[in-house]
Amino acid sequence: MSRSGVAVADESLNAFNDLKLGKKYKFILYALNDSKTEIIVKETSAEQDYDKFLEQLPENDCLYAVYDFEYELGNNEGKRSKIVFFTWSPDTAPVRSKMVYASSKDALRRALNGVSSDIQGTDFSEVAYESVLEKVSRAAGSH
């Protein structure tokens, strides 16, 4: 339970485990239910294209997301995969929504074991592939 009193739905954890362990999904979008009492799965996808993921982020509302971020290492060292947690809170979102999402984030984030990086996005430049790659690779110590 978070500071805001919001709980994490079991389906949210199950979907995350399917992404992490079963590689069933490439990304998961999480949202608060209509009564703002529980964090639920809004959408799951096996779509590999990062731009398709970005297209799912609403311009005027908040959400959380988990993305199985794959990237190439330099010097032909192969690919790496890191699970990234996104808090999407655009400047144009309603203030109340931003407040509830900010105060509920920790409940979800603590429940998701195995996340390697956290990205806070208020506009699309902060969640662009290159921006995320820089943060993920820095966290992995490959730069």
From Swiss-Prot:
N-terminal signal peptide: none
Pfam families the UniProt entry points to: Cofilin_ADF
Q: Which SUPFAM superfamilies match?
A: Actin depolymerizing proteins
* Residue stretches making up the ADF-H domain: 5-137
Major site of localization recorded for this protein:
cytoplasm
Gene Ontology molecular functions: actin binding
Give the GO biological process terms: actin filament depolymerization; cell division
Q: Which InterPro entries match?
A: ADF-H, ADF-H/Gelsolin-like_dom_sf, ADF/Cofilin
UniProt GO cellular component terms: actin cytoskeleton; cytoplasm; nuclear matrix
| Location in the cell | Cytoplasm; Cytoplasm, Cytoskeleton; Nucleus matrix
Keywords, A to Z, come to:
Actin-binding, Cell cycle, Cell division, Cytoplasm, Cytoskeleton, Nucleus
Task of the protein: Controls reversibly actin polymerization and depolymerization in a pH-sensitive manner. It has the ability to bind G- and F-actin in a 1:1 ratio of cofilin to actin. Binding to F-actin is regulated by tropomyosin. It is the major component of intranuclear and cytoplasmic actin rods. Required for accumulation of actin at the cell division site via depolymerizing actin at the cell ends. In association with myosin II has a role in the assembly of the contractile ring via severing actin filaments. Involved in the maintenance of the contractile ring once formed.
Q: Which family does it belong to?
A: Belongs to the actin-binding proteins ADF family.
Q: What is this protein called?
A: Cofilin
